[in-house]
Amino acid sequence: MATVVVIGGGWSGCAAAIGAKKAGCDVILLERTDLLLGVGNVGGIMRNNGRYTATEECIALGGSELFELTDKFTLHKDMDFPGHEHASIYDVTKIEKNVRDLIKSMNIDLRFISRVVDVETDGLTIRSVELESGEKIYGDAFIETTGSTGPMGNCTKYGNGCAMCVLRCPSFGGRVSITSRCGIEDMVGRRNNGDLGAFSGSIKLLKESLSQEVQKELNEKGCAVVPLPENLRNEEKLDLKVCQQYALPEFSENIVLIDTGHAKLMSPFFNL
């Protein structure tokens, strides 16, 4: 039986591991930190606009497992917010444990705190990947799903510095591009002004730290939109966002909060 090694345990890594297991392979899933889902732990927005069709297509094609979980732990359904309709919002405080339980129930070999730092190749074939500990993990096929975020040096050089985001590079080490270790040049995104990379489009706030009025609106409606005075509006932040579908004027003219279990403030940063 072939062994597939998946590098990175975010949503895409979990999906790849499940797909490989369903195809009859032995699967090893290597995750750099102590949690699955990566930025999915601060995500939450599903089925909005065209994502609804994409979700239903994936389910119809046999890839229902992860969508069943996000649907099961949905806090708000058929929710509208600026520029987006019929969204479902999953609870980020509950989703990771349940994805972890699913992965383990499928007998996928899940290994946390397993930061991959290098590869061993034979010509154009990858033989193994090397962990920070020096251990080598061998396989017949390797799938890189490490994403494109970090490490800290990039956040310092091209951003506002390390804010200890959910990826927690200071604790677990930064992401290493396995494709670049194989000699493949990574695609590099640029902003309109030519700067490299992009910012996360949102900030997570403790919902209980907000006013009772805002909490009530979030709990009941799933979303709160608070108009900003002219002097606090900053349209330049829109160009910084990774998710350009949220780079609409409404997101600079208002504070847009979404209830994901915590409060998701739809802005890359906000001066207090």
Regions found by a protein language model. Give the residues of each.
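Phosphate-coordination loops involved in phosphoryl transfer and adenosine-cofactor binding
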Residues: 1-3, 113
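Conserved active-site and cofactor/substrate-binding residues in soluble primary-metabolism enzymes
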Residues: 11, 15, 22, 90, ...
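Short amphipathic alpha-helical segments and helix-helix/interface helices
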Residues: 17, 99-100, 215, 272
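Conserved N-terminal/central alpha/beta ligand/cofactor-binding core
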Residues: 19, 25-26, 31-118, 151, ...
